[in-house]
Every structure is written in structure tokens, then in C-alpha cells.
From Swiss-Prot:
HAMAP family, A to Z: GpmI
Catalytic site: 64
Record EC number: 5.4.2.12
A biological process term (GO) from this entry: glucose catabolic process
Name listed for the protein in its UniProt record: 2,3-bisphosphoglycerate-independent phosphoglycerate mutase
Biological role: Catalyzes the interconversion of 2-phosphoglycerate and 3-phosphoglycerate.
Enzyme class at the top of the EC tree: isomerase
Cofactor details (free text): Binds 2 manganese ions per subunit.
Family: Belongs to the BPG-independent phosphoglycerate mutase family.
Gene label: gpmI
CDD domains reported in the protein's UniProt record: iPGM
Pfam families named in the record: iPGM_N (PF06415), Metalloenzyme (PF01676)
Length: 517
């Protein structure tokens, strides 16, 4: 062990919000004896994990990317959603130089501009207002042929809410007179991130070959999907008849999602010369492509509208520079969050940083296996703690969020109960070594599984506060202030005994003697 002599962990119960309403509340309905005993024994408070508190727009729900950025940064990190929104408001969006090549290409004879991305106001991966602004941009630039390839949400917004969003897009296209919606596809297909290439292939074939289900109109496409029992997320790729909006060689393409992870696979299929995810019917066909943000550091030849913002001196760097060992551990669904995002949005591994990736189960939807890989994550973490192999741990339990997204209440309850059991195992191992833990959530989700107004499944995140428990037998009498996610890193540094760097402008949640006086 290090000179600090005890392990300290940040344990993220992803999607475990605190909802005062018990209705369809998986957290309230589940049995969680370990969480309850920790709340009863140790200091605790609540954290705001949405809106301006995490660098989003007021009333905007948080997500895991945003949450882990703020957790590791020790300051509020203003998100890309806000940056784009501000640029639209001040007009600078419409004059970004990055648009020029793709617009010029689309204006060439026989060419078109394709706008593709998630069409909703969920604000997690995209925002419909950004698409509408791009249509306005195309009109200003006299682009005559614009085709929208709309990916349906149903996850960060209600499961059957696509039509009003699509109607807004169609109204804007009619107003400008420059295009049409060419295809629709549920995000399950168009935005897979787990290398399930058969899903990506279906979306790709609809977009580039016009292969898939067909419908005479957008409304008919959605209605037929609902009749097949599909909610928005799972709508099979559908081509709108009478709109030949296939992406052809030399066309211009703007992918307007701002969150990278679920956009990468389709971009690879469209852009890479040596692509092996599936067989493309016509092989590689180059297009003029722009993405809203940097989707991957390996996409060096794809222009981006809003470049990455890096966080100087995140917590992982402070821990590394102190000579301490750190472990990042999660299953596949949240691995990027405890590594890339917690490290400030950069692909970097600090000295002494070890990573353990536990594969997520290969199931169609996680309600089929609510425990996911939580037991394996816990088992591995306990092993590292018992063997004195690490000083600081960042651990994420994905279940409350990922199962919450399915909208299946019974499964979400089982997910919470599985995580509670695993939480107890990890905390007990830490305490046996004289260690400490800060237990939090990065946002809510399974704390509301039904839309209280409509009775439909509620599959998106919530705006509810999240718990924060300081498990430390050396600080049983400590008091914690209410705070935000940015306060967590300074709190952890205080517990470890490391000074907070000046770049972290958030305070520790621990009430000082002066404050308590």
C-alpha cells in the first residue's frame, strides 16, 4: 500500500436518482439494505446532476458523459449542447468555416446535402434545434437538395414521441422548400455503439441503398412501426417512397449528433476506406463529411464544427502526480465514462492508472438480464482492494441507468437490488482495509419508470437530485453540504489528503469548522 495507507473509492450508481414520488420508482420499490444501512450510519447529502449545475441548459437532464466530466474535473464543465445553442443564438453558427466545403459540394450538379442524426429534444446526443438550424443554413446558402435521415429516439424522450419531432422537421423543410425526410431509423440500429454491426448495416443500407421497410410518408412509416410493436428506439430502418434520398458518391453529409459514442460506427461505415464491419454493397464511396463534434481521435481527416474542450488537471492527473495508484473499473456500457470522460474527455492514461473492462452481457435489451455484469465488476474490485493493489478507485455500476432505459419496471427493481448487493460487497472490502468511499449517482433514471401524465413507459433520465454518501469511519461526525457533481473531486482529494489544484474551482462538500461554527 502507499503511504496514504488506505484505499478510497468513488462508486457511481449510474441512474439512481432520488424521486420523492414513489410511483413506478424502482429505487423506492426495490429492497436495498446495504444502501439503507450506509445512509443510516454515514454522512450524506444530495447533489444536483442536471441543468446549469452540470453545464447544461436550464431544465436539461444530465447524462453519463456530462456527469463523469464534471466528476473528474472538479469544476462545472460547460457542455457542447450549450456551446452550440449559444452559437445559434448569436449567429456565429451560420458562418463557421467548416460548413463551406460540404455546402459547396452539395450545390454541385447532381449532388445533395444529407443531414443525419437523432431527431428529438432529449439533448443527450443531439437536439432538434440544431437540425432546424442546419436546414436554415442550407436555405441561406442556396442548397437545393437536402435530405434528412432521421434517427428516432424513444429513450431520452418518451418511447412513442417521434411524430411531433418529425412533423417539426417536415414543416421546416416545407417552409424552406429545399428537401424532405428520406429515411427514418430507430437509434437501436443507427446508433449502436457495441460493434453489433448487423444493426448498423441495416441503417446504412437504408441510407445509402434505399433498402429496408418502405412507407408512403413519414407518418405512415411511424404508424406501421407502432403496428409492428416497435417503439421509436427500435423502429426498423424505413425508406420513404417517392424521396430518392440515397447518399451517393460525392454528396455532402453533416452528422449533427454532438455526443460521439453512438455516432462512430455509422461514420466509420460511411467514411473509412478499409472498413470491415460488414460488406458494403458498392464498397467505399467517398463523401464530403462534417461531424458536429470530434467523434474519435482517429478520425483525423473528418472536419468538426465544434472541437473538443479539454479539462486541465482532472482528478486522475492529481492522483497520478502524487504517486498514487488508481483503478478504473466498469462494464462495457460505462467503461468510457470512468476512463475517457473522468479524465477530462481525452484518451490518456495517467501513470499508475490501471483499467479493468468487464464485458457487458450480449442481450438484445438489458431487461432480459437486469444484473448485467455488476457481480463481476464487484468481484474484480473486491479482489483489487483485498490484494492492496490500488489507492484510488473509480467504479461504475451501470444497471440502474441501462435497465431504466428499457422502461420495464420489474427489471429495473431487480437491477437496483443487484447493485445494492454489489455495493455492499465493495464497501465492506474497503472498510476492512480502513478505506473510504464516496457513493453517488451521475443522474437519475430508474427513479421514474412511468410517465406520470400519460402512463407510458418513462425511459429517459430524470431531473431528480442524486445521493451522495461519505462512507468513512474516520468521519462519522462530518457534515456534508448539498452540492453539484463538480464538488465530488475536491471532496475526494480532501479525504485522500491531497491539495486541490487551482484549476478546480469547486469546493469540497465537507463542512469546515469555520462553516459549521
Amino acid at each position: 500500500m502507499s503511504a496514504y495507507r488506505r484505499p478510497v473509492a468513488l462508486i457511481v450508481l449510474d441512474g439512481w436518482g432520488l424521486n420523492p414520488d414513489p410511483r413506478a420508482n424502482a429505487v423506492a420499490m426495490a429492497r436495498h439494505p446495504n444502501f439503507d444501512r450506509l445512509m443510516a450510519r454515514y454522512p450524506h447529502t444530495t447533489l444536483t446532476a442536471s441543468g446549469e449545475a452540470v453545464g447544461l441548459l436550464p431544465g436539461q437532464m444530465g447524462d453519463s458523459n456530462v456527469g463523469h466530466l464534471n466528476l473528474g474535473a472538479g469544476r462545472i464543465v460547460y457542455q457542447t449542447l450549450v456551446r452550440i445553442w449559444r452559437s445559434i443564438q448569436d449567429g456565429s453558427f451560420y458562418t463557421l468555416p467548416v460548413w463551406r466545403p460540404v455546402l459547396d459540394r452539395a450545390k454541385q450538379p447532381g449532388k445533395a446535402l444529407h443531414l443525419m442524426g437523432l431527431v428529438s429534444d432529449g439533448g443527450v446526443h443531439s437536439h432538434i434545434d440544431h437540425l432546424l438550424a442546419l436546414i436554415d443554413l442550407a436555405k441561406r446558402e442556396n442548397v437545393e437538395r437536402v435530405y434528412v435521415h432521421a434517427f428516432l429516439d424513444g429513450r431520452d424522450v418518451p418511447p412513442q414521441s417521434a411524430l411531433p419531432y418529425l412533423e417539426r422537421v417536415e414543416a421546416k423543410l416545407k417552409e424552406t422548400g429545399i428537401g424532405a425526410i428520406a429515411t427514418i431509423s430507430g437509434r437501436y440500429y443507427a446508433m449502436d455503439r457495441d460493434k453489433r454491426w448487423d444493426r448498423t448495416e441495416k441503417a446504412f443500407l437504408a441510407i445509402t441503398q434505399g433498402i429496408g421497410h418502405t412507407a408512403g410518408s413519414v407518418a405512415e412509416a411511424v404508424e406501421r412501426a407502432y403496428a409492428r410493436g416497435e417503439t421509436d428506439e427500435f423502429v426498423q430502418p424505413t425508406v420513404i417512397e417517392g424521396v430518392d434520398g440515397r447518399v451517393r458518391e460525392g454528396d455532402g453529409v453533416i452528422f449533427f449528433n454532438f455526443r460521439p459514442d453512438r455516432a462512430r460506427q455509422l461514420v466509420r461505415a460511411l467514411h473509412e476506406t478499409a472498413f470491415d464491419g460488414f460488406k458494403r454493397p458498392e464498397g467505399y464511396r467517398p463523401v464530403e463529411l462534417v461531424t458536429m463534434t470530434q467523434y474519435d481521435q482517429t478520425f483525423t481527416d473528418i472536419p468538426v464544427a465544434f472541437g473538443p474542450q479539454f479539462v486541465d488537471v482532472p482528478m486522475g492527473q492529481v492522483v497520478a502526480e502524487a504517486g498514487l495508484r488508481q483503478l478504473r473499473i466498469a462494464e462495457t456500457e460505462k467503461y468510457a465514462h470512468v476512463t475517457y470522460f473522468f479524465n477530462g474527455g481525452e484518451e490518456r492514461v495517467f501513470p499508475g492508472e490501471e483499467r479493468v473492462l468487464v464485458p457487458s452481457p450480449k442481450v438484445a435489451t438489458y431487461d432480459l438480464k437486469p444484473e448485467m455484469s455488476a457481480y463481476e465488476v464487484a468481484r474484480e474490485a473486491v479482489k483489487w482492494i483485498e490484494e492492496d493493489r490500488t489507492d484510488f478507485i473509480v467504479l461504475n455500476f451501470a444497471n440502474p441507468d441501462m435497465v431504466g432505459h428499457t422502461g420495464v419496471l420489474e427489471a429495473a427493481i431487480r437491477a437496483v437490488e443487484a447493485v445494492d448487493e454489489c455495493l455492499g460487497q465493495v464497501v465492506d472490502a474497503l472498510l476492512a482495509k480502513g478505506g473510504a468511499a464516496v457513493i453517488i449517482a451521475d443522474h437519475g433514471n430508474c427513479d421514474q419508470m412511468v410517465d406520470y401524465e400519460t402512463g407510458a413507459p418513462h425511459t429517459n433520465h430524470t431531473l431528480n437530485p442524486v445521493p451522495c454518501i461519505l462512507v468513512d469511519d474516520q468521519r462519522l461526525d462530518a457534515k456534508l453540504k448539498p452540492g453539484v457533481l463538480a464538488n465530488v473531486a475536491p471532496t475526494l482529494l480532501e479525504i485522500i489528503g491531497l491539495p486541490k489544484p487551482p484549476q478546480m474551482d469547486a469546493d469540497s462538500l465537507l463542512v469546515s469548522n469555520a462553516e459549521g461554527a
